[in-house]
UniProtKB/Swiss-Prot annotation:
Protein's name in the database: RNA-binding protein 47
CDD domains given in the database record: RRM1_RBM47, RRM2_RBM47, RRM3_RBM47
Ranges where the record places region Disordered: 1-26
GO CC annotation terms, alphabetical: apolipoprotein B mRNA editing enzyme complex; cytoplasm; nucleus
Comp. bias (Polar residues): 1-21
Organism (species): Rattus norvegicus (Rat)
Organism domain of life: Eukaryota
Omega-N-methylarginine found at: R396, R407
GO MF terms, alphabetically ordered: enzyme binding; enzyme-substrate adaptor activity; mRNA 3'-UTR binding; mRNA binding; RNA binding
Domain notes: The RRM domains are required for mRNA stabilization.
Role: Single-stranded RNA-binding protein that functions in a variety of RNA processes, including alternative splicing, RNA stabilization, and RNA editing. Functions as an enzyme-substrate adapter for the cytidine deaminase APOBEC1. With APOBEC1 forms an mRNA editing complex involved into cytidine to uridine editing of a variety of mRNA molecules. Through the binding of their 3'UTR, also stabilizes a variety of mRNAs and regulates the expression of genes such as the interferon alpha/beta receptor and interleukin-10. Also involved in the alternative splicing of several genes including TJP1.
GO biological process, one term: mRNA processing
Domain RRM: 71-149, 151-233, 246-318
Subunit structure: Homodimer. Interacts with A1CF. Interacts with APOBEC1; form an mRNA editing complex. Interacts with RBPMS.
Amino acid sequence: MTAEDSTTAMNSDPTVGSSTKVPEGVAGAPNEAALLALMERTGYNMVQENGQRKYGGPPPGWEGPHPQRGCEVFVGKIPRDVYEDELVPVFETVGRIYELRLMMDFDGKNRGYAFVMYCHKHEAKRAVRELNNYEIRPGRLLGVCCSVDNCRLFIGGIPKMKKRGEILEEIAKVTEGVLNVIVYASAADKMKNRGFAFVEYESHRAAAMARRKLMPGRIQLWGHQIAVDWAEPEIDVDEDVMQTVKILYVRNLMIETTEETIKRSFGQFNPGCVERVKKIRDYAFVHFTSREDAVHAMNNLNGTELEGSCLEVTLAKPVDKEQYSRYQKAAKGGGGSAEAVAQQPSYVYSCDPYTLAYYGYPYNALIGPNRDYFVKTGSIRGRGRGAAGNRTPGPRGSYLGGYSAGRGIYSRYHEGKGKQQEKGYELVPNLEISAVNPVAIKPGTVAIPAIGAQYSMFQAAPAPKIIEDGKIHTMEHMISPIAVQPDPATAAAAAAAAAAAAVIPAVSTPPPFQGRPITPVYTVAPNVPRIPTAGIYGASYVPFAAPATATIATLQKNAAAAVYGGYAGYIPQAFPAALQVPIHDVYQTY
């Protein structure tokens, strides 16, 4: 029987009735006949809703609960003119399909990706192994990987005195399908929570509906607004891989608990079994010499107290490169092919709140060397997954823990190991300024007493278009408008000083005040390299306010400026108004 014959039979059989009506989304499709033939062969139904065409869900004769998490795979790089009649025969070769969802565009073509859910988890794993890079058309390969089935929401703005039971009760009142609420104690005060929680739902659809209902402006909890977004989903690690893990993840530690204390506590069952401990704020990773020792310590110490805090101990989760790269892309609101990640191997805990991303969440005032690992930007647009098909978290902070405060990369803590801290040089001894910028900036105060009150303010310097020009001309623009004109009575002395510039004077007194250019500023720290050019100070002429002090006399002199006497090469010690001198342009801060 051909596809046309089956269509005619289905529509003409009077005993079938209204059930033979062509489903919406199939009627008028370019391959309508092929889709109807597929439905007749397999007995699956097909319906289009929310921008996706769903095949099955459940399959004919299905009895029992919905398949567990991990049974779904993501299929990408699908040619836009390939539909279920070509996809189903390929994917049913590795197991029984529970449901196939093909994302559709308004023009009737697919959007390049689909989700295939199998009845059992091992069938999904087999699909990833055998069908990834499957050639669906000549030269067109499919991309198949495990689907990130996100059933977890992040909820911020929770009163810090609320307990887990109170939060669970309140969330269950306004949303459906709540399975669990994960709440973490504050690092500083274990009696308080951290102002946020993670809510797990029975399905992704239930989580999506809850997120829509809890969006800001629609509902309030405890009398004020809350922040709601997708949390990063739990990473699913292969069971065979987990059987080799011998690293424990320990959380809910006290801030003051030391690595040595943790090592003694976890090594008490078998002395010498702990290789090393890495503690980060209030969580830690404990490395064991064998898996047996790790499991034994976990079973005996989970739920016990250490220095007054109840410990939570689990096995750390290793992440492969491809999977970790996909999760990083998902955290930025995108998808696509996986790329290699240099920081491997690494371990992450599935829901670790003990990262710097939590301490300012949902605010963007995140500071520190790992800030780029916390703040995620971007949104799901164009062909991104949306509504019930969304399998990516939103553009929020990361919460997956691990060996770093960012996303579980242990090596990030050691990238700068042994590297000396960069430090700027001081113009004024013992001057302390809080570091607020990677470039060291310290002020120097100078004065020109002969200016008078008529020059009480500086003219604004025009902003140059090139940074180097700005460095060269900044001080010139500031000093030139207030430069003191030379006294005619001293013109002869100035001319004599200029004539004597070709030789090194034998006297220790400086030349006339008005005939002396400012030379490069020197640091007060001995043996510090100095910039050999006049730099930002240009060729402006200013007077010295006082003779050299004992401190200046002991400093290193600039041989090129020796013609100007013992004071040459040092910045004048007083101006009537304070100037903020950008020291990083004068001294090398590396």
